[in-house]
Amino acid sequence: TDVSVSAFALKVLRATRDPDVLQLGVAVPHSSLLPTRVLNGILARIARRDAGRGVSYDFPPGSPELRRQIARRALDAGCTLSPDDIVTTSGCQEALSLCLRAVTRPGDTVAIESPAFYGTLQTIEQMGLKAIEIPTCPRKGVSIEALKLALDRWKIKACLIVPNFSNPTGALMSDDNKRRLVQLCESRKVPLIEDDIYGELQHAGQRPLPAKA
C-alpha cells in the first residue's frame, strides 16, 4: 500500500503525544531543557500590561514592534534588514510555503537536501511540486558539486537549503561553502530559499552566519 508523505507525517505527529516515546521525529527539545518558568513569567507580564493584545488578530505582514525587534536581532547574524523586509508567519512551514508559492508553480522542480525534514517533503507534495534530492554530508552540509550537476541536468525553479544545523543531519556548512552556494544560485538565476530556523542553536561562541550574510 502506498503511503503519502502527509499520512506518514501525521503518524509521526500523533506519536509526539505519547510520553513514553523519545521524540526523534520532531525538532522539539524536552521541556526540562527550556527556561519555561522564565518564559511563562514574561508572558504573564506582557498579558497584564496589554491585556487585549493577546486575544486580537495581527494582520500581515505582522506586528510592527515584533518586526523591528527581528530586524535588530538580524544584525547579530550579519544581515541588514528593514522591518519592511520582514513578514511574520505562524511557523516555519508557513514561511517556506509562502516562499515556494512566490517562485514556483505546480509541476515545478525544487532542489532540497537529502535527507530532509519530512515537513518539507509534505509541503512540496501538497503544492504539487517535484523534489530533486541533493546529497548532504553530516559534517559539511549539502554537496555544492552535486547541486551544480543537478542544475546542469534539470530545470530547477528553487533551492531550499538549511545551511545551519540541518534537520535531521545537524550539518553545519562552512562560511566558504555558503558563499559558493549563493554564488552558484546567483549565477544560475535560481532563487535560494534559506531556512535558518536552527541558526541560534550554537552551543558556544558566536552563532553561525546565515548564507544571506
Label each PLM-derived region with a short phrase.
Residues 1-44, 68:
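N-terminal basic, amphipathic alpha-helical segments
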Residues 43-188, 193, 199-213:
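Conserved core of the PLP fold type I
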